[in-house]
């Protein structure tokens, strides 16, 4: 099989994503491909897609195409908040994530940690659309009502855990791919339940949207494994959040920086 290059991947993505009213713009300086449709834009980092392709083959490209198509579909979808509060969920994003749409609409958010911010989304089935502040007046709902509905719905989501162990350190993974895996970090009842179960230090990570990692850390090896694991997930995620894990103590999440086999407290 011929080696996949950045230009070959660019051409393939343009071919597979080609559609009426859709434009492409390639930035040679940082090797990104912007896809625009009806004023909505998605920017793809081609070297990352090539790296994923080398590991996963065509499945990596299919995943990107699906992500873009569903994103445009969500942007075009109608949002009726008033009678559909069961479709509202909180989602976690990096603090650097844009707080406005391309059209300048302010997104509904809440503060979370120094590394993360809470946004609110309206579930559309296979995708979701971020809730804008302007939608609340039309729906005659308050920020508080949206928040309460979102966290109530989050509490009803199942949390299946997969467990792995490395040298006495246990790691639990939430990977349902329902779009809200990282959001489980906001389920305080679940965090308290895990804290009671864990015998070491409880360290969590949300490197990207589709994974939550919980570590029962007993020693420096555990911190080292978690640090490498988090960086790997962060690099592979379609929607990266943060490469910094969080220590959970007394009901609070505190970001920490882990280097090599040492844990450095913030």
Curated annotation (Swiss-Prot):
Disulfide bonds: none annotated. InterPro entries: DUF1444. HAMAP family: UPF0354 (MF_01548). Belongs to the UPF0354 family. This is UPF0354 protein LMHCC_0955. It comes from Listeria monocytogenes serotype 4a (strain HCC23).
